[in-house]
């Protein structure tokens, strides 16, 4: 499975996580790692760009929901 995950600034206080490919049980750890790195750096205002995602399974959805819960704890 091929996936690309990139980050970039998306405004003065926000960062975008651009994902391309398929998010499944094999690729979701990469997405989770990227998001968690931003959260660990204190970046809580995230935009997750899924325009390039062709498929997402329940594992991928779980990663996104987990990230949402983490950033909401910090009013992100």
Task: Mark where each language-model region is.
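STAS-typified acidic loop motif
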Residues: 4-33
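Amphipathic alpha-helical interaction surfaces in cytosolic regulatory modules
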Residues: 22-76
């Amino acid at each position: 499975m091929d996936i690309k995950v990139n980050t970039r600034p998306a405004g003065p206080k926000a960062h975008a996580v651009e994902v391309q490919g398929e998010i499944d049980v094999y690729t979701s750890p990469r997405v989770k790692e990227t998001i968690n790195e931003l959260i660990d750096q204190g970046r809580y205002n995230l935009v997750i760009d899924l325009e390039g995602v062709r498929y997402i399974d329940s594992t991928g959805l779980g990663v996104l929901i987990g990230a949402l819960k983490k950033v909401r704890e910090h009013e992100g």
